[in-house]
Amino acid sequence: MLAASTRTRQINITCDNPVDREVFLHYSLIPSLCIILVLSFLQRREHRRQRDDTSYLLGNHFGIIVPLDFVGTFSNRWSYGAAFGATANKVMFLFSEGYQPLTVPQWAQAFVLFIGGMEVGLSYFPFFACLSSEFQLVSSILGFSYSLTWFVVTVLQISQCPHGQFLGRFETLVFYWPSLLCLGFLLGRFLHMFLKALPVHLGLEPQTEEKSMLEAHQAKHVKQLLSKPRPQEGEKSWFQTRVYEWDPCFQFPSRMVGTLLLAFICLYLFIVIEFCVFLHVRDKLDMFEDKLESYLTHMNETGTLTPIILQVKELISVTKGVWVVTILPAALTCVTYLFHILACYRKHMKRLWAGDKHFLPQKFHSPSSAASVVAIARYSGWQIAYILWGYLIIHVVQSLCGVMLMYGLVLPIIHHRGLEMLQGFGLGVLTLSIVVGLIILQVWIAGTFFLQPKLGTSDKQKPLALNNRRAFHNFNYFLFFYNVLLGLGACLSRLLISCLLGTWLIARIDRTIMQSGYEGADMGFGAWIGMLFVDHYHTNPVLVSFCHILITSHKDRKLQKTVKYWCLNQSAGPRFSARARTRWFLLQTLINNPRLVMLRKSKSGHSSGEFTQILLTCSDC
């Protein structure tokens, strides 16, 4: 009772904070819009329509600002991840439907949540816009000022009200330290951008060259495809074989890194909130136990209900202990899923680059283009929601399994009924072993007596040809009635395994938990497939390299035309035939990849059989 009253006194403690992040979020829209207008004014419009009188004064200013290229951005990945992480607290408020700027009827809650999401996105838009802007000097100053403002507001909120109602001391710090860390990282990033852009603006350093559309890892991937496969040097370690192997020819886009970091922070906040709810429920249960004891003390003088009281108290105690213990395995399961999703993303992308779609269900081989474009916007948010809901469901299932384990194994030993428990456990294991043994025996009898012998000594199994047909028909007849009973258990085991796998893999958006033929009902898996195809079509290294060659060659030709007396300059050096150079490159490619000769079209009158045979012979050597 004393502990309960102490906790009650701690819950009743209130704090008047003059700085509220929720209220500041509304006022932050004003500087956010100002920063957006400044960056939009600096952004030039590349394609302008014919100007009229109303837009004459604007010129080619006020271009569209891109906060983040969700498809092809591979630089500043951790900076974008920190910007996503700074929004974690607001994302959790949106997830719990606790952030509603307006009070409307129940049927209009969806519109209110949409407006709230737009307000949160607009408030944090300057972080992303300043990171992606080409005008680094101005954007670094604006981004640093805006990040510093949010940093100061967060520090003031933590310092004014550090303690809370549920966790007690430093509760506010427990909730807001991830956002504070991300804001500090952004401050350092914007300061670094300012120190790099200032010498360029003052003319002390040359201006950086225009960024190429071909990333370094994409060029390495194409070079690896065009080169001969090298023999593997040494054996792979256990970590490389079982966990992860780093690939220098592959990089995760900024969207995936930001989603991963935001999912980690949201999962942490979700666990903290869940623990706060658990503390509140535990206090209520303690008060319920005290009231139950006092009530039964006055009403139950004979003591007939005492065993029921003890069982209820034992159930409450076991449930509370199991719930706390299973927090760690449930959290580790979801953390493992996050890393595994990255590994699956790389594996699936490489298969799509190689033209392999066999790992996808048949109906997802050609997804809708519109649905794929929407999927690239849905994926990040859905991935976080799947992880949070998956953690809660996994935690509940693990808690139920823990309670069953306690009542099945631990509590009988505590109550000195271990021998009875072992007897029941032994009978259950024996029954299950007999059933499984009969199933295996049926397979052995069928393979030994009812199949014809192997056709060759190298065959792995007997052919599917019946032998001893009369005995086989009697075998089927007498086992028919037993298999009816066996099918009941098989049906229940199918249901149990499906439930366990479904709940265990609910957070895995990279694979469907639906049956074959019903994968289209899994919207999360559809978003994953659509996102993969968008990335495949827009970041394929071979396609990007081809476009890069076209763009650079086009620029070179335009530059050659602008140079005066370019004919004289070109005649000064040796002249090469473009056709001969192309044939030389073709020969080099065929020598490195002799199997490609079989895929070439043969022209009439040009027999290349000897050359093909030579290349194929070289490939076999």
Swiss-Prot record:
Residues linked to a glycan: N12
GO biological process: establishment of localization in cell; retinol transport; vitamin A import into cell
Pfam families: RBP_receptor (PF14752)
Assigned GO CC terms: plasma membrane
Membrane topology of this protein: Multi-pass membrane protein
Primary residence: membrane
Keywords for the protein's UniProt record, in alphabetical order: Cell membrane, Glycoprotein, Membrane, Phosphoprotein, Receptor, Transmembrane, Transmembrane helix, Transport
Tissues where this protein is expressed: Highly expressed in liver and small intestine. Also expressed in spleen, kidney, colon, stomach, placenta, adipose tissue and isolated adipocytes.
InterPro entries in the record: STRA6-like
Upregulating conditions: Induced in adipose tissue after high fat diet. Down-regulated by holo-RBP4, retinol and retinoic acid.
Transmembrane segments annotated in the record for this chain: 22-42, 54-74, 111-131, 138-158, 174-194, 259-279, 322-342, 384-404, 425-445, 477-497
Record topological domains on the Cytoplasmic side: 43-53, 132-137, 195-258, 343-383, 446-476
Localization terms from the record: Cell membrane
Parts of the chain on the Extracellular side: 1-21, 75-110, 159-173, 280-321, 405-424, 498-621
GO molecular function terms listed in the Swiss-Prot or TrEMBL record: retinol transmembrane transporter activity; signaling receptor activity
Post-translational modification: Glycosylated.
Positions of post-translational Phosphothreonine modification: T612
Function: Acts as a high-affinity cell-surface receptor for retinol-binding protein RBP4 and mediates RBP4-dependent retinol uptake in the liver.
Name of this protein: Stimulated by retinoic acid gene 6 protein-like
Organism: Mus musculus
Gene responsible for this protein: Stra6l
